[in-house]
Amino acid sequence: MPIKAILTDIEGTTSAVSFVFDVLFPFAKKHLPGFVRQNAGQPAVASQLQAVRTEAGEPDADVERVIAILLEWIAEDRKATPLKALQGMVWEQGYNAGQLKGHVYPDAVDALKHWHQQGYRLYVYSSGSIQAQQLIFGCSEAGDLSGLFSGYFDTTSGPKREAQSYRTIAQAIECPAENILFLSDIVEELDAAQAAGMITCGLARDGGVLVGHRYVSSFALIDPASF
């Protein structure tokens, strides 16, 4: 079956893992406490703080305790949805202020533009929040790439290592799984997508082997028509 849609991961795939861990996470850790204190009364922020209390099992936690919980989650690299949402808000401020620029590999930029021109529908699936995804591509070093994408998915669609998440995404974009090419640098994610019926291609940018999948070192080596 021909590929009609391409679903891509971000970290280690379109973008350097180091950008996330060495730039984005430290920025959020530094600015999150002040952001929460200043904006705790804003509805969008307050709802996320309440979600933190619920997930932590501390319904009566005050703002300072919630901040402490968030910093603990950051230290644990916990994929908590309210943490991701709040990080996204902090990053948005940073991007809008010009303090942050999203990293996207040049080979990924070129390929995504080419595939878009060829008529492939492009989607993102990352553990980072949808807002954070949109910021990386919308405020990238290569300019605004957001117009290339037809949609974004995060952990609200399910964990990235579970096949059902990929079935959910296929249904959401109204495209049979066998017509979707999924790109990632993580074998367990590729396995889950494959189990859901998707076609897979791994990115091994630093060498290595992604067992059970076709894999390449650059987006320049991916031809969707060859799958």
UniProtKB/Swiss-Prot annotation:
One of its GO terms (molecular function) is 2,3-diketo-5-methylthiopentyl-1-phosphate enolase activity. Keywords: Amino-acid biosynthesis, Hydrolase, Magnesium, Metal-binding, Methionine biosynthesis. It comes from the Bacteria. It catalyses: 5-methylsulfanyl-2,3-dioxopentyl phosphate + H2O = 1,2-dihydroxy-5-(methylsulfanyl)pent-1-en-3-one + phosphate. One of its GO terms (biological process) is L-methionine salvage from methylthioadenosine. The keyword Magnesium applies. Binds 1 Mg(2+) ion per subunit. Its cofactor is Mg(2+). Pathway: Amino-acid biosynthesis; L-methionine biosynthesis via salvage pathway; L-methionine from S-methyl-5-thio-alpha-D-ribose 1-phosphate: step 3/6; Amino-acid biosynthesis; L-methionine biosynthesis via salvage pathway; L-methionine from S-methyl-5-thio-alpha-D-ribose 1-phosphate: step 4/6. Coiled coil: none annotated. It is an enzyme of class 3 (hydrolase). The keyword Transcription does not apply. Its EC number is 3.1.3.77. NCBIfam families: enolase-ppase, HAD-SF-IA-v1. Monomer. Belongs to the HAD-like hydrolase superfamily. MasA/MtnC family. Bifunctional enzyme that catalyzes the enolization of 2,3-diketo-5-methylthiopentyl-1-phosphate (DK-MTP-1-P) into the intermediate 2-hydroxy-3-keto-5-methylthiopentenyl-1-phosphate (HK-MTPenyl-1-P), which is then dephosphorylated to form the acireductone 1,2-dihydroxy-3-keto-5-methylthiopentene (DHK-MTPene). This is Enolase-phosphatase E1. The lineage of its organism: Bacteria, Pseudomonadati, Pseudomonadota, Gammaproteobacteria, Pseudomonadales.
